């Protein structure tokens, strides 16, 4: 990207004159690079079956090559300062010609990124209990490379003049020294499927996942005492939960239900959390907090009646609220500093969708079909975004001073906090015609 800036910014003419200027990649106002990373993966799987036992074994191989370079000295990434060797007494060291000797350890040079290689074993086990029940267990490693932006962002390593104002990507892959590695999830699951009668089945699953090497930002201090952030892996999270399923089928009628009870915890909710808190002189989080996708209850149910000529299906979704950071107005600054992220939950929400089809008689060999889709049948206004002060949408804590100080020719003060995107989409109806020939 390139930012369009005012050429008079930071001068006495800033408020009266404007001349657009586009800076190049040697400044903090642009980030331009061209890279060609390479990625390869392969998966092997084998199955063993004997009597009531089935065992699946798999192994996945992933290779990623950023195909780029990175600075060898993170404390002086662009060689903005030159450093020379000094003697113990503090005087400069000279070579045989009387010239100053550059301190190579404090200077940076381009270094090729390593190729990241990962092996992920997977194991599945199933045991049939009689004719109408199956006990199953699974274990597996799942690896995911960080997003490309975490590798290539600010590739020129331009560090701004103020602390905590700059972030750089990290192409030092597969390294234990301020490196960037794949995020690793180790998953365990055990479950039981039981046929209650020929038309009904029930399944229960217990699962637990460890998430290692979550993306984070480490703080690096340059030799000029400017602190900036660099992507690395140092955060951890885990997920544990219970899943219940009930399926019913009778002729043209079907019912499918799914309920999940889940906890998600970690020491940081997003990669920049620790970096931002440190930049704001806020203590780091020293306990597990709910992650942004933590959702205690999830319940889905589908009801349908389908024939060869017509059919209709209704699906309902219920979700308990996800976390947000409650920051009440009027609290002391010390109390606000000590508030942990994601300390409260948004309101729960539900949605009902409806789909249907009708196969019309053929016309000149063509088969027309009518399709119906209704999203959010009840036109429910689910609150997906909330105010950090009230915990609800379209609300805020406003005093008279704030109202009197508002000056605008374009909007009212209420427009500041009444954001329509906080709510779910309204009812949507689609009718379609499909012609098969």
Please place each PLM-identified region on the residue numbering:
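Transmembrane beta-barrel strands of outer-membrane/channel proteins
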Residues: 1, 57-63, 137-141, 150, ...
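Residues that define the transmembrane beta-barrel architecture of outer-membrane proteins
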Residues: 36-40, 115-119, 184-186, 238-240, ...
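Membrane-embedded beta-barrel scaffold of Gram-negative outer-membrane proteins
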Residues: 128, 136, 140, 146, ...
